[in-house]
């Protein structure tokens, strides 16, 4: 996928207007260890990305310069991610945390990816792991008619409306974010 997604001499700004979706299978580095200081209180912390790039256009986001491309890569091998998470959690007597949404917004394209539909079912069964879902999206349909899952954390970015308008282009308003909580 990198031959299509991230070659040199692409125009990020032009692609951001109408990005393409690239479906791919991630083959290595499915689950990565976070830096030691990157924790919300767990002994072991990991991150992963089921997708590369974001539909939003936040001016301060490192994704604006991370890749040469504004196209989206959606990894389709969710079971491989889940199997890696299960390996990390097996035979552990302590809680682990897995952060989703490092290279994307975890909820933004849920209607296309079905990422959470798959992952939430799996995390219900993994008693010693937490899943943190990072988002600015109000795309919460996946949670409707579902009982809360005790080991799933939804981390919303909430900023004053003036900051949202100035720096977080294409994102929901503060009111919409709060209403979705």
Model regions and ranges:
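Flexible, acidic/Gly-rich N-terminal and inter-domain linker regions that tether
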Residues: 1-44
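Conserved Radical SAM active-site core
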Residues: 24-40, 59, 63-155
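Short connector loops/turns at beta-strand edges and beta->alpha or beta->beta junctions
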Residues: 35, 55, 157-161
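Cysteine-centered iron-sulfur cluster-binding motifs in ferredoxin-type domains/subunits
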Residues: 48-58
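Short, conserved loop/turn and helix-capping segments at secondary-structure boundaries
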Residues: 75, 170-174
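Surface-exposed cleft-lining segments at the edges of enzyme active sites
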Residues: 104-108, 161-171
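Conserved C-terminal portion of the radical SAM core fold
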Residues: 175-181
């Amino acid at each position: 996928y990198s031959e299509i997604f991230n070659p040199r001499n692409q125009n990020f700004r032009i692609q951001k207007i109408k990005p393409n979706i690239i479906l791919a299978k991630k083959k290595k580095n499915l689950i990565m260890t976070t830096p030691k200081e990157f924790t919300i209180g767990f002994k072991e912390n990991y991150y992963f990305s089921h997708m590369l790039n974001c539909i939003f256009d936040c001016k301060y986001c490192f994704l604006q310069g991370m890749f040469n491309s504004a196209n989206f890569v959606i990894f389709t091998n969710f079971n491989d991610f889940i199997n890696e998470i299960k390996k990390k959690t097996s035979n552990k007597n302590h809680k682990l945390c897995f952060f989703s949404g490092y290279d994307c917004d975890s909820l933004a394209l849920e209607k296309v990816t079905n990422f959470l539909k798959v992952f939430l079912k799996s995390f219900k069964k993994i008693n010693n792991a937490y899943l943190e879902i990072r988002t600015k999206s109000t795309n919460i349909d996946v949670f409707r008619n579902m009982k809360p899952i005790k080991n799933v954390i939804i981390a919303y970015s909430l900023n004053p409306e003036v900051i949202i308008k100035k720096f977080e282009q294409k994102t929901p308003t503060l009111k919409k974010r709060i209403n979705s909580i």
